[in-house]
């Protein structure tokens, strides 16, 4: 990824960055429109997710997370920008004529070949079950449920590590630091997700944030008491409570919010590091 730094011609471009190499030219049969009605609101028009709204129109690129085209080699034709994610995507031309998008693995170049199957080479971009991978393999796009497609480790620069196998389960260390069990029959893609420098990208101005469909975040302490438990007071007042809370009165900043009766509770060997 080649990051271009804007010249400081105006305050809005100061320290702003943009990717100057990867462009977007999607195929018409692999894209479709999205209907965004009432950003962050439910069917009654009530805000259920704050700080969402506006944003540029997007076309959704249909990504092949399942990688279920077995033992048919494909060639990387393009590496493209996707407005729906931080990671890049690449267009694959398979030997039987079909074309699909996949997540771009780090280091993959135009002209490289990839394949998915049960016993394929341990090569960057290839997809295969965990049972056929050696220990220490760096992987991404990991399935949780067999045949459902990759759901874990799909963000830009993300990578997980296969650290153990025992019985029917494999032990993975995820980017968050969590160590959990996954069925060895589930598939994953070898390598790391591309666009590692996405976390170093600077938007430069508030308008760039609005283009992404994200609205401003306002602190509760500067609101009125009717709007937030931290609100009110004369001047710059403290929150007036023993512990900080959410806008709805629940404990915030450190309290665990994960449900205790989830089925995956027994599959997590070590919680994610904060």
Curated annotation (Swiss-Prot):
Residues 7-24 have a biased composition (Polar residues). It comes from the Eukaryota. InterPro entries: NA-bd_OB-fold (IPR012340), Rib_uL2_dom2 (IPR014722), Ribosomal_uL2 (IPR002171), Ribosomal_uL2_bac/org-type (IPR005880), Ribosomal_uL2_C (IPR022669), Ribosomal_uL2_CS (IPR022671), Ribosomal_uL2_dom3 (IPR014726), Ribosomal_uL2_RNA-bd_dom (IPR022666). The keyword Hydrolase does not apply. SUPFAM superfamilies: Nucleic acid-binding proteins (SSF50249), Translation proteins SH3-like domain (SSF50104). Keywords: Chloroplast, Plastid, Ribonucleoprotein, Ribosomal protein. GO terms for molecular function: rRNA binding; structural constituent of ribosome; transferase activity. Residues 1-24, 222-274 are annotated as: Disordered. GO terms for cellular component: chloroplast; mitochondrial large ribosomal subunit. Gene3D superfamilies: 2.30.30.30, Nucleic acid-binding proteins, Ribosomal protein L2, domain 3. GO terms for biological process: mitochondrial translation. Its main location: plastid. It is found in: Plastid, Chloroplast. PROSITE patterns: RIBOSOMAL_L2. Part of the 50S ribosomal subunit. Belongs to the universal ribosomal protein uL2 family. This is Large ribosomal subunit protein uL2cz/uL2cy. It comes from Jasminum nudiflorum (Winter jasmine). The gene is rpl2-A.
